[in-house]
Regions:
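Short, surface-exposed amphipathic charged segments that create phosphate/polyanion-binding patches used
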Residues: 23, 38-41, 111-113, 187-194
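Signature of the SF2 helicase/ATPase Hel1-core->accessory helical subdomain module
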Residues: 1-21, 137-157, 161-170
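Conserved nucleotide-binding/hydrolysis micro-motifs of P-loop NTPases
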Residues: 12-15, 28-33, 78-79, 102-103, ...
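A general structural motif
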Residues: 68-70, 121, 171
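Long, largely alpha-helical accessory region at the distal end of helicase-like NTP-driven motors
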Residues: 61, 65-66, 70, 77, ...
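Conserved helicase ATPase core of P-loop NTP-dependent helicases/translocases
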Residues: 72, 81-84, 92-132
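Conserved segment of the helicase C-terminal RecA-like domain
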Residues: 151-157, 161-195
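Conserved interdomain linker/interface between the two RecA-like ATPase lobes of SF2 helicase motors
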Residues: 2-75
Length: 237
């Protein structure tokens, strides 16, 4: 089973110190005017000014390893990627959006700019799914997830964009904005490698992740995120 094999490889690679350590923060996505971000959230809610400011505050708070940020931000819709990139740029960042319509030349230029340390180079690339696998950007030192977790495979692939070792970073920061998503239970499955879907083990991992994860990596969930994941575990068939 490919899903199981992929997760076992991640766990073993971490144990053998083959990957860059990561610090994962599962934090609550914003509630806007009593609307909780979920799988069916309206586009306008996802690009609300207050949410953008909240996201920027959090990615600044949690930071990165190195002299400057080299970040990837995964979102759920192409329109969202383009709009959020515009809004970040209005707030002083240098970002771009890459979707499936981008040419190979555009992708390569964006990746080269994200890797660069020169003035004017990209701080972030917003994308939906084209960076899930097969992309090598070793300097990535921050990954933000602004989308539902639809499978443990995709979660690990997106996390993996920051796990290449590089002498300009000691670790990668992963910030997962957790809404009230139906499939939040995939988060502990992906991070723990627990493929038998034992609900008690998944709950324990969410509560005690730092005690279980191999190597120097750490995992933290805030209390509301824990409750949302526990709820998804309880409702999962």
């Amino acid at each position: 089973d490919y899903n199981i094999a992929y997760e076992i490889r991640l766990q073993q690679a971490m144990e053998y110190d083959l990957l860059c350590p990561f610090h994962y923060y599962g934090i609550t996505d914003m509630t806007i005017d009593d609307h909780v971000i979920d799988d069916k959230s309206d586009f306008n809610l996802l690009v609300d000014e207050k949410r953008v400011d909240y996201v920027i505050d959090k990615i600044n708070d949690y930071g990165y390893s190195g002299d400057r940020v080299h970040g990837l931000i995964f979102v759920s819709r192409k329109e969202e990627a383009h709009r959020l990139s515009e809004m970040f740029n209005q707030r002083g960042f240098n970002t771009c959006a890459l979707t499936g319509e981008a040419t190979e030349k555009q992708r390569q230029e964006a990746m080269d700019s994200l890797e660069s340390n020169e003035d004017g180079s990209l701080d972030y690339i917003f994308t939906v799914d084209i960076f899930n696998e097969g992309i090598d950007i070793p300097k990535v030192n921050q990954v933000a997830m602004l989308r539902p977790t639809q499978s443990s495979i995709i979660f690990i692939q997106q996390l993996g964009r920051g796990l290449r070792k590089n002498n300009e970073k000691d670790y990668v920061v992963v910030i997962d904005f957790i809404g009230n998503y139906e499939k939040n239970f995939f988060i502990p499955i992906a991070l723990s490698g627990n493929t038998n879907f034992n609900k008690d083990n998944l709950r324990r991992f969410v509560s005690e992740g730092n005690l279980i994860i191999p190597g120097a990596s750490t995992i933290q969930f805030d209390e509301i995120s824990k409750k949302r994941i526990f709820n998804a575990i309880d409702l999962a068939k």
